[in-house]
Amino acid sequence: MKGAKSKTETRSSKLSVTKKPAKGAGRGKAAAKDPNKPKRPASAFFVFMEDFRETFKKENPKNKSVATVGKAAGDKWKSLSDSEKAPYVAKAEKRKVEYEKNIKAYNKKLEEGPKEDEESDKSVSEVNDEDDAEDGSEEEEDDD
């Protein structure tokens, strides 16, 4: 049996086949997020989760696992009928409408750009530095 490999040779060849991506080949840096941008609204399930967390904590005060709460909530959500989900869907829809209104106002504000009256801190300090230079002499003298 020429060319047959032993078990250890087979294992080592399988291990050597796996390749790791080169450094820097991953995702690029994410763009800086604007802290003033409105947050996206919660889905009906997450609105349900807000209520469910409170009741679950009361029933299971010793539970510290987030995964357990999430799993229990998911199971409960799946077991609910459409009529039982309706109030959560309505709340989510209401939040979505409010979000759309806020995002339109936010985008409109972005399109307008900064107002001319407002100056950035940097430009104000540059103006003050120029004023200071005009008031004093060109060269600073030591009083020693």
Swiss-Prot record:
Coiled coil: none annotated. The modification Phosphoserine is found at residue 125. GO terms for cellular component: chromatin; cytosol; nucleus. One of its GO terms (biological process) is chromatin organization. The keyword Phosphoprotein applies. One of its GO terms (molecular function) is DNA binding. Residues 1-42, 57-94, 106-144 are annotated as: Disordered. InterPro entries: HMG_box_dom, HMG_box_dom_sf, HMGB_plant. Mostly expressed in cotyledons, hypocotyls, leaves, and flowers (excluding pedicels), also present in roots and stems. Residues 38-107 bind DNA. It is found in: Nucleus; Cytoplasm, Cytosol. Keywords: Cytoplasm, DNA-binding, Nucleus, Phosphoprotein. Pfam families: HMG_box (PF00505). Belongs to the HMGB family. Binds preferentially double-stranded DNA. Confers sensitivity to salt and drought stresses. This is High mobility group B protein 2. It comes from Arabidopsis thaliana (Mouse-ear cress).
